[in-house]
Amino acid sequence: MNFQKGEIIAIDKPYRMSSFKALAHVRYLLSHALHHKVKIGHAGTLDPLATGVLVLCTGKCTKQIEQLQTHTKEYTATLQLGATTASYDLEHEVNATYPTEHITRQLVEEVLHQFEGDIEQVPPTYSAVKVNGDRAYALRRAGEEVQLKPKN
């Protein structure tokens, strides 16, 4: 492998590790093994509580990052129906619960179909989206209100 010329690497990002920290760790390992600094970037981010494929590009392949981000993605999730948190994930405690008796497999499948294809969604305020140079989740953790625009 020629990391200076450019390689595309897929890693399984660990739970509770930021995408940046995962990238920094791989950069350190490569630079240490090769005895020189390696240019490296990631094609998209995963939230710290998410695990899964993080695509890393080295050397001249970093120029392909924007194009790689246009590819379709598929997600799987484990969730608790009838409970909400401030961050929509396990980072915060459950702050409200709702009845779930009416929820059927058919209803879940119908709702999931609404998330297929080209859709617009407002990201959660506890997300990695940048707002005036700062991550939305950092602003929220500092107690600031965040208004995010829908993304495709």
Describe the function of each predicted region:
Residues 1-152:
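Catalytic/RNA-binding core of pseudouridine synthases
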